[in-house]
């Protein structure tokens, strides 16, 4: 709830505090698509590109959950589209894996590098092929 969140911040809550897995309130809000809370947290100084213990960022969490509005909000606030997790997986690879053409196109428009490789040497196009997402092949070629 936006009102409660603002009250906590006004009372001195650390917007960049992390849980036992290194996740921040911003990451959780993005995973849940709580855009008003995302805005409040960012306005209060939440670090948009923080990563948890497995290397996931707020943008990656939003991509995993396919929260379109949240993704757009993060991109407009200059989230790094080319961050990668501990396995080298990027937001673009997650979008490709999920089979989300509009998300793949949006990430590319915001500068996602389709040639980045994960730790296994795979690029986003490999995720498309491995998971039978043929509709994405023309976008990523």
Indicate residue ranges for each PLM-predicted region.
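Leucine-rich solenoid repeat scaffolds
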Residues: 108, 113-141
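Alpha-helical adaptor scaffolds
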Residues: 53-56, 60-72
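Ankyrin repeat A-helix N-terminal signature
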Residues: 1, 28-34, 61-67, 94-100, ...
């Amino acid at each position: 709830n936006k009102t409660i969140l603002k009250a906590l911040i006004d009372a001195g809550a650390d917007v960049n505090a992390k849980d036992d897995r290194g996740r921040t309130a911003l990451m959780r809000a993005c995973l849940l698509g709580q855009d008003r809370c995302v805005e409040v947290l960012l306005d209060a100084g939440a670090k948009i590109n923080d990563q948890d213990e497995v290397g996931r960022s707020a943008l990656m969490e939003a991509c995993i959950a396919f929260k379109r509005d949240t993704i757009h909000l993060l991109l407009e606030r200059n989230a790094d589209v080319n961050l990668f997790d501990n396995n080298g997986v990027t937001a673009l690879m997650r979008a490709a894996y999920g089979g989300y053409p509009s998300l793949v196109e949006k990430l590319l428009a915001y500068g996602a590098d389709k040639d980045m490789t994960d730790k296994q040497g795979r690029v986003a196009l490999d995720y498309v092929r491995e998971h039978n997402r043929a509709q994405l092949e023309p976008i990523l070629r």
